[in-house]
């Protein structure tokens, strides 16, 4: 089911000192400085390479990482199983004093999760209290093959069945179309946006590639393979694995077992409960039981979905701005909450506006976020967007977000660039074939497995319930120039609805880094800044060497 990356004997000898295995898609990072782990994961998200190959090619033999010196000391140590036994003994003593949950919050692990479908990545990234870096579709062309096939998963439910050949053939055709159109988009953008003299070649080419990848990504199916780097505490991993055990997808359940195996090399005692029948297994059964009951209840709803806009503001507090003023004054007043609310209601509008401006302050950039008083204000948005945009917005975890199953039922988006290169016919044909494949899979294996066939261009319904402080972060970040045009449009509309539908003019206007402008080469400025940072880093390194 998984491609095994080839390494030489010498490479495996190096890798075995820093990773818990050299031949499986899930592995933990060991014996590395924390800064190296972070840098490795950061590079990982923009590279087509596996983490182990990236480590060998770009990190291992660089003296500034200190990796080679660590490798020499590790080579002389006792075997890993003995070190784990010693750690277990220590953890047992600590647990007896402080309890499992308290200690499990303080120990963590870096885990690489490779060859994950884009259904699995959403399950991995569900938990709030963890850090994730996922391979981006905007910096990598998915037109290369591993071991003779494109980078997609044939789910265990389908592999070896009579539908497997049809499934694989349709996937190959879809990726053939993607490969053709992503290169055609790149050539089109090169003609449309020729390199200007003041822009370096690498910056221009990176911007062109990002725009082409953005335009063509709608053809990538949910079965597309990705890599995810995770850093989480033992407690967060436990919650993740227990939730994954309850999944209806065999890929997710198989991955759970692989993750548990690797994590037990590095934080074994934190994960003792996961596969114990009376503890983690019972917990997983609770999740699956509730899901089964709700599926049954949901199937009896007779209503058909109404026609709605791409973004709807469905709930907000009409008194939000008054409550915000009361909360802003709470920490500096010495007055009880209800008394402050009464005072805020009596304030003239001009005075409330003055207090709010003082509380927001003079923001020099979007990272200067105002305080927690904004967390008293909330907004609930119902969104019907392409799955590709959902993948980006779903990464925001300081809010409540739930989604429905991915299906072809809500139609799909056609990017302007596809029309411009005269490829709309191929786009429609490819997506139509995948809708037919979805129906076959749905009939044979049910709607959960059928999701693998649905490309990113198809629309998915989800809600996002957030407080105003998180709205500052999300809307200002996701409308910035370098963002994908589709999710920029969604977040621009959220901002407009806060101001115009909710009538929260003061709050919306305080989000002064929300960008409603439109751009051509969205990544150009960001790539310029990246190049400048690389140059400064190289100069600093040359001065110290």
Model regions: which residues?
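A conserved ligand/cofactor-binding region detector
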Residues: 1-545
């Amino acid at each position: 089911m998984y491609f095994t990356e080839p390494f030489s004997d010498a490479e495996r000898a190096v890798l075995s000192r820093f990773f818990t295995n050299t031949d499986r898609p899930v592995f933990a990072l060991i014996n590395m400085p924390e800064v190296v782990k972070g840098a490795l994961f950061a590079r990982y998200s923009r590279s087509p390479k596996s983490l182990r190959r990236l480590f060998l090619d770009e990190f291992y033999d660089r003296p500034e990482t200190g990796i080679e010196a660590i490798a020499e000391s590790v080579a002389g140590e006792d075997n890993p199983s003995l070190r784990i036994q010693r750690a277990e003994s220590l953890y047992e003593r600590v647990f007896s004093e402080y309890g499992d949950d308290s200690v499990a919050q303080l120990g963590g692990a870096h885990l690489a999760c490779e060859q994950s479908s884009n259904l699995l990545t959403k399950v991995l990234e569900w938990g709030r209290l963890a850090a994730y870096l996922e391979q981006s579709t905007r910096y990598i062309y998915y037109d290369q093959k591993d071991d003779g096939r494109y980078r997609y998963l044939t789910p265990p439910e389908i592999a070896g069945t009579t539908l497997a050949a049809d499934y694989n053939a349709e996937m190959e055709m879809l990726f053939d179309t993607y490969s053709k159109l992503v290169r055609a988009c790149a050539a089109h953008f090169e003609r449309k946006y020729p390199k200007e003299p003041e822009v370096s070649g690498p910056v221009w080419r990176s911007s062109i590639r990002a725009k082409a990848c953005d335009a063509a990504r709608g053809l990538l199916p949910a079965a597309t393979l990705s890599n995810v780097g995770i850093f989480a505490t033992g407690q967060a991993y436990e919650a993740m694995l227990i939730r994954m055990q309850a999944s209806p997808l065999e890929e997710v359940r198989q991955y759970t077992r692989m993750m548990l195996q690797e994590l037990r090399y590095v934080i074994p005692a934190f994960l003792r409960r996961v596969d114990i029948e009376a503890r983690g297994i019972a917990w997983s059964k609770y999740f699956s039981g509730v899901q089964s009951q709700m599926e049954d209840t949901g199937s009896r709803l007779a209503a058909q979905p109404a026609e709605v806009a791409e973004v709807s503001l469905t709930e907000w507090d009409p008194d939000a701005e008054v409550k915000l003023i009361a909360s802003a004054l709470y920490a500096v007043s010495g007055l009880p909450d209800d008394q402050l609310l009464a005072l805020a209601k009596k304030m003239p509008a001009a005075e409330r506006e003055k207090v709010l401006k003082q509380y927001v302050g003079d923001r020099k950039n979007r990272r200067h976020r105002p305080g927690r008083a904004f967390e008293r204000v909330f907004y609930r948005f119902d969104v019907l967007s392409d799955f590709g945009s959902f993948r980006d917005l779903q990464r925001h975890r300081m809010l409540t977000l739930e989604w429905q199953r991915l299906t072809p039922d809500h139609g799909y988006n056609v990017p302007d660039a596809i029309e411009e290169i005269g490829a709309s016919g191929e786009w429609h044909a490819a997506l139509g074939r995948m809708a037919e494949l979805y129906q076959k899979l749905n009939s044979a294996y049910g709607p959960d497995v059928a999701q693998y066939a649905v490309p990113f261009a198809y629309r998915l319904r989800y809600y996002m319930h957030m407080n105003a402080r998180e709205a500052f972060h999300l809307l200002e970040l996701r409308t910035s120039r370098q963002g994908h045009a589709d999710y920029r449009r969604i977040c621009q509309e959220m901002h407009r609805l806060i101001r115009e539908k909710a009538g929260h003019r003061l709050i919306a206007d305080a989000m002064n880094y929300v960008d409603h402008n439109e751009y051509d080469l969205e990544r150009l400025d960001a790539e310029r800044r990246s190049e400048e940072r690389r140059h400064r880093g190289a100069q600093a390194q040359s001065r110290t060497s």
